[in-house]
Amino acid sequence: KNLPECNVEMVTNGDPLNPKRLNKLFESGLDKILISAYDGKEDADKLEDLCVSANLTKEQYIVRHRYYSEEQDFGITLSNRSGLMENAEFKIESLKEPLKKPCYIPSYTFFLDYQGDVLMCPHDWGKKVILGDFKKEKLLDIWFSKKSSSIRKMLNKSNRNMEPCNVCDVEGTFMGKKNAGYFN
């Protein structure tokens, strides 16, 4: 209601979904759901059928195939997840020096985890930067807080000298340049 031009999306592995829950999410204001299928085509087909049974339109959902081979990068663009992939099975080393490029991700979106923590970036799996608590604070207060604004300004000026950005290999300029202009 308060942000009619805001697009609300959710990313999930689909485990907790059923038709009733899907419909409730969309009734509550969700615009699109992106569901990652990791276990093969059968899994993807089941998720597709689930969305159809909930009467979702093709514009309301995307089932993302994440089960491809290692040679196909598993169907995803791999990153070091802000330095957390060094100890993973598929090691991607942390950067020794921060990228000297802007990152616009916090200028056009934020991420809400299942506990209500508002994160600046989907790559901050270690939750190094928590912008606020959605259970206790209003979205706009978190979005326009000193902390959020300061981080956006730093990253928009190619300054990644803060955790976890200093070890992150994500380009961060794929989208959001126009939005970044509002925060400089």
Give the location of each predicted region.
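Flexible mid-to-C-terminal extensions adjoining Fe-S/redox cofactors in radical SAM and related proteins
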Residues: 123-184
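Core AdoMet radical
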Residues: 5-17, 30-67
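A general structural motif
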Residues: 5-7, 27-32, 100, 107, ...
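Short clusters of hydrophobic/aromatic residues that line enzyme substrate/ligand-binding pockets
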Residues: 17, 103, 131-134
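A C-terminal junction/extension of Radical SAM enzymes
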Residues: 48-121, 160-175, 180
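N-terminal active-site wall of soluble small-molecule enzyme domains
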Residues: 1-2
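Conserved, mostly hydrophobic/aromatic
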Residues: 10, 116, 139
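Distinct, well-ordered alpha-helical segments
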Residues: 19-25
